[in-house]
Structures are given as structure tokens and as C-alpha cells.
């Protein structure tokens, strides 16, 4: 008889988190609050996209924002100037948020009468894809300067998101970026994904993005 046990810690952690995420989703559903988990690598334009989104939707719905960073309040201070409710989450060195951390943030934010909460996850293409936050939908930003090979290098991230925003299309002429190749690679991983080209800087494509998002929020609240 073996004198030790083998514990599948990673499997156990994921299973526990998945259960907590499902419970959180049920709570948000009852409150009619839509949670968007927005992921990307650092420097992709997440915060600028969040600002554009708030500006476009602030007269249609009440919006809250959870800003996740390892250690900083820069983005939270910027977003707070829009008038949206903001909570800064410091992950203490962790490169992602899980369902428990997200719930803590939502409790701090207060979701009463909040239609949409945007969770700006930690800038990383690996860890955030592995942990269900309890979000209603998952979104990702890929910026043109990052290159068109990211779906090949980080397939899990592209396979779990509902919508992909390809940002910084205003800089397309300056980079060797094959937009059609990205769409083809992504749809092999995730056939139902919505792909929207945008420029958070100029505002191009933002209308299509907010129409998609507002429709998802309404559908979530109507079910």
C-alpha cells in the first residue's frame, strides 16, 4: 500500500471555482445585472475601450466597473472620471481573477440597479482564460501591433470568448497584420465567436460593439 496520497490540486481548484462561478451567475441573473469579463494582453487598449463603451451607453443603462491590476490604481482613476461606479481590485501578484475575487468586487461595488458591470481583467492572455469569473459573457481585445499569430499561440483564450474586438485598426497600415487570417484561425477554435474591428482611439467600429453589447444585456435581463 502506498504511504502517500496524490492530490489533483489544480483540478480541485478549477472545479471549486466553476461551482462558485455558476452560483454567482445565478445571483447576477436574479439581480438582472450583466457581467462582462474583458480580457487582453497589457497595452491592447482595454481601458480606452471601456471609456468608449461607457460614453456610448451611459444614457441607456447604469454601468459599474471592476478594475483588476496586480498593483495600481491608474486605470480606476481614469474610469472614475466618467461618473461610473468603480472598484479597484488588487490581485496581490496573481495574474487573474477567479469567481471568489469577482464576487468580492461586486459586493464592494454594489449591483443594485446596475445593468452592466465591466470587469477589466488583469492584462494577460494565459491565466484569465483558465478561470471562470461568473461572467455573463467573455470578451477579448487583440490589438493590431500584437500580431496576427496570437490565436496560434494562445488558443484557449480565443476558444472561450464570445466576442473578439480587434483594436487599433487605425494603425493597420503600419503593421503586417492579416485580418482575414485572424478571423480564420479564431473561427477554427471558436466557430460562434463574434469578431468586431474597432479603433478605441478614433471611435471606428465602436457603434457595432455597443449595439452587440447592449443587445446581450437586454437579452440577459429578459430571460
Task: Show where each model-derived region lies.
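Short acidic active-site motifs
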Residues: 23, 153, 205
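Active-site glycine-centered loops adjacent to acidic/histidine catalytic or metal-binding residues
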Residues: 69, 167, 199
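Residues at the C-termini of beta-strands that transition into short coil/loop
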Residues: 90, 142, 199
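Conserved C-terminal guanine-recognition region of P-loop GTPase G domains, centered on the G4
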Residues: 128-135, 144-192
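Canonical P-loop GTPase G-domain recognition
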Residues: 171-223
Amino acid at each position: 500500500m502506498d504511504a502517500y496520497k496524490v492530490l489533483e490540486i489544480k483540478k480541485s481548484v478549477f472545479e471549486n471555482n466553476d461551482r462558485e462561478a455558476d452560483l454567482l451567475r445565478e445571483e447576477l441573473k436574479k439581480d438582472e445585472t450583466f457581467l462582462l469579463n474583458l480580457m487582453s494582453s497589457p497595452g491592447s487598449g482595454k481601458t480606452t475601450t471601456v471609456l468608449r463603451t461607457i460614453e456610448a451607453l451611459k444614457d441607456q443603462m447604469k454601468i459599474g466597473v471592476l478594475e483588476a491590476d496586480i498593483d495600481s490604481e491608474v486605470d480606476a482613476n481614469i474610469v472614475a472620471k466618467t461618473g461610473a461606479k468603480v472598484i479597484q481590485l488588487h490581485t496581490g501578484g496573481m495574474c487573474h481573477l477567479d469567481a471568489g475575487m469577482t464576487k468580492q468586487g461586486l459586493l464592494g461595488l454594489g449591483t443594485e440597479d446596475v445593468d452592466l458591470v465591466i470587469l477589466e481583467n488583469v492584462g494577460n492572455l494565459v491565466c484569465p482564460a483558465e478561470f471562470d469569473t461568473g461572467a455573463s459573457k467573455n470578451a477579448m481585445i487583440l490589438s493590431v501591433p500584437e500580431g496576427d499569430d496570437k490565436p496560434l499561440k494562445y488558443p484557449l483564450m480565443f476558444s472561450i470568448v464570445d466576442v473578439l474586438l480587434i483594436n487599433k485598426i487605425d494603425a493597420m497600415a503600419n503593421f503586417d497584420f492579416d485580418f482575414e487570417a485572424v478571423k480564420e484561425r479564431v473561427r477554427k477554435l471558436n466557430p460562434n465567436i463574434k469578431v468586431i474591428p474597432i479603433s478605441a482611439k478614433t471611435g471606428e467600429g465602436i457603434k457595432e460593439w455597443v449595439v452587440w453589447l447592449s443587445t446581450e444585456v437586454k437579452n440577459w435581463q429578459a430571460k
